[in-house]
């Protein structure tokens, strides 16, 4: 029995060769990687379905409860803001009415008090001057007339005596003529009347009466203020009795969506079968890929056993070749002498002319030998030293250890390449699954459209509510302002008429009427007319305009703030894409290992060159 393995013994272990084991490890790596992706996809599928169901619940709450809550809150805020606006308007009106009443009273005091006082003082002074002047004139005239009468009386007395004397004589002549006697008597009577003539003091009395009758306007001022205060009093009393709630329209006009209107949910649930289909298709691809990789790996591993069998035969043949070379060398030795027993102890391993290692490398490293022959032909250098150095470099680079590093690096590159191919297949499939995305996006657009429709309806009814509040406020509250200004205008008109009546009754047909009317018109009437114009302007402008809700701005705000949650479909595909990206990054990170191994193997090239040049002789052992 031999103490070493024969060829048939080694053939029983050919399936344990390094190539089959490497292929098996490579296959297991790819299969495990695919199963890792499958498990992640399973988890993501469960997460997506769970999130989809959760999204349906959220959308149901959002679409059912949130709009109702927002409607209720918005309606409450609108009603509250309208109520506060009405109450603030009422309080402001009270202040405005008090201020207006005080201002008008001040104007009455100013125009009918100050100016009238000055005017009356001026008139009183003028009448007093006229009365005093008249008294002096009357006194001077009367004194002059009295003195003249006295002088005339003395002269006439003498004339009368003379005439009477002559008359006695003439009477005897004209006894039958009574006209002469009458004329004489008349002359005496005329003188008598002249004696009694003087200017009457009634003129002075009339002037004094006129001075006492100059109007003081006190009654007019009091009457005007009383008339002005009447509408203000009634307005303030009505405002204090106003209930702000009564000015607001019925809240039933405001829109409140019924939760039974919902017809779109489940939004995402109806697409769960499509989501499952996407994941199942991906998982099916990976499972089929695993089966194919496993089958292919088994066949490759079995196929790798064939080269191992061939290698065993070749190694056996190479071993025989080495043995033949040794035998041939021994046969060629010239030591065949019958008397010499040294041939019995001869060993080629001790012969310096026979290099057993070179024979082994030449027969057991065919790759290095083949590379040496090809490179020698390529560079066209057949020198022995160059050929030996090249052969040494090839043997060093493709030694068993270096070849193992190189093989591991290449296998790693192949593994990473297969993983990247699988990842790219999944990525391509995801890029072709936009149909579900379009369907879900269409559903999302439909929901947004319905939300916008609800917003339009709500804002329309809310604006109707604001319109009703504004109309009630302008009619029931600011209508009093209209009535008040109309009453003030009527009072002012009455005051103007009364002033004109007083002037007419006091100064008509007198020299003072025209200047008095001019002065009063300038000092008082123009001011009252200005007040009347101001009241007319207030009457035309006294109304409130409440702001309306802008539908476009509200929809834009809702769009900018992402008020409606987006569909879960994009989130689902984002998760799958993240997994694919993570797997791609993992594969790319694994690429560093085979590249590092290839880099280590490449470092053997400069080391081989360095060692080949440092060899002292080309025939030495390596």
Curated annotation (Swiss-Prot):
Main location: membrane
Membrane topology: Multi-pass membrane protein
Location relative to the cell: Cell membrane
Superkingdom: Eukaryota
Family note: Belongs to the PRM1 family.
Role of this protein: Involved in cell fusion during mating by stabilizing the plasma membrane fusion event.
Protein name per Swiss-Prot or TrEMBL: Plasma membrane fusion protein PRM1
Gene behind the chain: PRM1
């Amino acid at each position: 029995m031999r103490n070493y393995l024969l060829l048939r013994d080694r053939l029983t272990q050919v399936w344990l060769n390094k190539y089959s084991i490497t292929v098996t490890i490579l296959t297991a790596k790819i299969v495990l990687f695919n199963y890792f992706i499958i498990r992640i996809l399973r988890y993501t599928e469960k997460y997506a379905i769970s999130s989809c169901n959760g999204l349906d619940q959220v959308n149901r709450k959002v679409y059912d409860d949130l709009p109702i809550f927002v409607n209720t809150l918005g309606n409450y805020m609108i009603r509250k803001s309208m109520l506060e606006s009405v109450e603030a308007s009422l309080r402001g009106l009270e202040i405005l009415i008090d201020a207006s009443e005080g201002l008008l009273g001040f104007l009455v005091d100013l125009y009918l008090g100050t100016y009238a006082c000055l005017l009356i003082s001026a008139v009183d002074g003028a009448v007093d001057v006229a009365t005093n002047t008249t008294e002096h004139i009357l006194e001077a005239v009367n004194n002059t007339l009295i003195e003249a009468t006295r002088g005339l009386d003395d002269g006439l007395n003498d004339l009368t005596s003379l005439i009477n004397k002559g008359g006695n004589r003439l009477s005897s002549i004209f006894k039958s003529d009574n006209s002469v006697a009458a004329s004489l008597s008349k002359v005496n009577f005329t003188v008598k009347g002249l004696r009694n003539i003087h200017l009457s003091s009634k003129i002075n009395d009339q002037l004094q009466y006129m001075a006492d009758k100059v109007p003081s306007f006190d009654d007019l001022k009091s009457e005007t203020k009383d008339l002005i205060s009447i509408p203000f009093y009634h307005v303030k009393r009505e405002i204090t009795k106003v209930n702000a709630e009564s000015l607001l329209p019925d809240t039933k006009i405001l829109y409140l969506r019924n939760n039974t209107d919902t017809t779109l949910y489940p939004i995402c649930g109806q697409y769960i079968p499509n989501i499952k289909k996407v994941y199942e298709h991906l998982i099916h691809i990976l499972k089929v890929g695993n089966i194919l990789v496993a089958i292919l790996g088994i066949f490759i591993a079995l196929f790798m056993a064939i080269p191992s069998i061939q290698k065993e035969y070749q190694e056996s043949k190479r071993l025989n070749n080495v043995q033949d070379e040794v035998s041939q060398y021994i046969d060629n030795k010239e030591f065949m002498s019958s008397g010499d027993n040294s041939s019995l102890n001869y060993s080629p391993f001790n012969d310096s002319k026979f290099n057993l290692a070179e024979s082994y490398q030449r027969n057991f490293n065919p790759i290095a030998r083949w590379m040496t022959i090809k490179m020698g032909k390529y560079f066209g250098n057949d020198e022995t030293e160059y050929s030996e150095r090249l052969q040494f470099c090839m043997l060093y680079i493709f030694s068993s250890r270096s070849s193992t590093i190189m093989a591991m690096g290449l296998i790693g590159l192949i593994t990473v390449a297969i993983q990247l191919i699988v990842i790219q297949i999944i990525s391509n499939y995801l890029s072709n699954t936009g149909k579900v995305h379009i369907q879900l996006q269409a559903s999302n657009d439909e929901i947004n459209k319905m939300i916008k429709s609800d917003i339009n309806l709500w804002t329309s009814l809310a604006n109707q509510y604001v319109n009703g509040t504004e109309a009630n406020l302008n009619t029931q509250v600011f209508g009093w302002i209209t009535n008040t200004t109309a009453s003030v205008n009527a009072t002012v008109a009455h005051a103007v008429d009364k002033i004109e009546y007083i002037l007419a009754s006091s100064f008509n047909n007198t020299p003072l009427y025209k200047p008095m009317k001019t002065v009063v018109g300038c000092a008082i009437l123009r001011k009252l007319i200005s007040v009347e114009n101001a009241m007319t302007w207030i009457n035309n402008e006294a109304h409130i305009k409440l702001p309306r809700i802008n539908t476009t701005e509200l929809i834009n705000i809702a769009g900018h703030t992402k008020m409606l949650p987006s569909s879960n479909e994009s989130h689902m595909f984002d998760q799958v894409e993240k997994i694919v990206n993570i797997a791609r990054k993992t594969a790319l990170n694994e690429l560093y290992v085979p590249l590092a191994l290839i880099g280590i193997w490449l470092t053997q090239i400069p080391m081989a060159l360095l060692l080949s040049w440092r060899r002292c002789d080309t025939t030495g052992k390596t």
